């Protein structure tokens, strides 16, 4: 990540560490020229009348620009660069972000078409994790991805449709929103819909139309401090887009979501899966949750946090596992096994 705070302060983030560069821009005019070149190359406009812009570069990097008068200390530009090759689950395991046991478990949930939400704070690695998780989607399915700025790098799926939202032009026309794209995607005969991130009223269509309308296995991400906070934020975002009693919205969310994976960025700057939570349903006036895995910190070693993603409970909602061909005996016996007529015998997860 490259953070340019005016002409004199340029910060770089690499491997989770932020440090200040010794590079400088010679003048505000030069910095503004660079910003205009980048914006024009991405077919975007930015000026004092419209001082904020988000854009995607040809190499996939994401750019955010804020100009005066909004940026009080001069032009601000943040560039997030992505690796040429998507991060894999194996890499996340090697980095200590998640355990092999939890990965095996999540792999089977994806194959069994559980609706999964990835939550976490800014910079916690939600998109990276969602991308790695999507590698377990069967390659013969039709997948539609929907994003504000295209970041997902799904590989190996030939029947893949990638959609990206578009801002309005200078006349305030021509905008294509995430909500527009979800509605369109529902007419494209998708097996699964993956929304990079929900931030507003598009949550109504993601929850009510996609996840509850025959598109099991859909996935998305959202900003939250913990799984319960994610549910509250989803409630708020749905209320932005539809007039329904809160209880009806809570019931829809409880029916739509199966599992929430919560990520965090710890004080040593590492990114880890902190909790995997099952959504049990709506009961006693609230959405009921059950923790399946939780990260237990065990101390520091060489400046790094050590710990284990501990299993706390068995998954309760097993209907999709059974529909995917995993045996009830295997589930109750402490492992998930797929019936022989489906192949992949003896997959040990639970």
Language-model features and meaning:
Residues 4, 9-112:
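P-loop NTP-binding catalytic core
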Residues 118:
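Hydrophobic anchor at the beta1->P-loop junction of P-loop NTPases
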């Amino acid at each position: 990540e490259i953070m340019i705070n005016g002409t004199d302060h340029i910060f770089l983030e690499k491997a989770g560490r932020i440090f200040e560069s010794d590079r400088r821009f010679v003048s505000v005019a030069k910095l503004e020229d660079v910003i205009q070149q980048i914006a024009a190359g991405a077919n975007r406009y930015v000026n004092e009348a419209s001082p904020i812009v988000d854009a995607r570069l040809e190499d996939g990097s994401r750019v955010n620009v804020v100009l005066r008068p909004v940026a009080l200390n001069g032009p601000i530009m943040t560039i997030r660069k992505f690796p040429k090759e998507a991060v894999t689950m194996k890499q996340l395991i090697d980095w200590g972000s998640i355990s092999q046991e939890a990965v095996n478990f999540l792999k089977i949930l994806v194959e069994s078409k559980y609706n999964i939400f990835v939550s976490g704070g800014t910079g916690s690695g939600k998109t990276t994790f969602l991308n790695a998780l999507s590698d377990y989607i069967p390659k013969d399915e039709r997948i539609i991805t929907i994003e504000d700025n295209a970041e997902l790098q799904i590989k190996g799926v030939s029947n893949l449709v990638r959609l990206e939202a578009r801002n309005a032009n200078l006349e305030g026309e021509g905008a294509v929103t995430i909500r527009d794209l979800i509605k369109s995607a529902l007419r494209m005969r998708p097996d699964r819909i993956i929304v990079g991130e929900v931030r507003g009223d598009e949550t109504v269509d993601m929850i009510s139309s996609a996840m509850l309308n025959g598109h099991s296995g859909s996935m998305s991400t959202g900003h939250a401090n913990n799984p319960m906070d994610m549910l509250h934020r989803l409630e708020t975002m749905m209320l932005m887009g539809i007039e329904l009693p809160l209880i009806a919205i809570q019931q829809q969310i409880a029916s739509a979501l199966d599992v929430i994976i919560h990520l965090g960025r710890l004080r040593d700057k590492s990114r880890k899966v902190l909790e995997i939570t099952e959504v049990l349903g709506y009961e006693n006036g609230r959405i009921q949750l059950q923790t399946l895995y939780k990260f237990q910190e065990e101390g520091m070693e060489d400046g790094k946090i050590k710990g284990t993603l501990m299993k706390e409970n068995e998954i309760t909602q097993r209907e999709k596992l059974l529909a995917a061909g995993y045996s009830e005996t295997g589930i109750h016996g402490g492992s998930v096994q797929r019936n022989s007529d489906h192949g992949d015998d003896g997959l040990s997860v639970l």
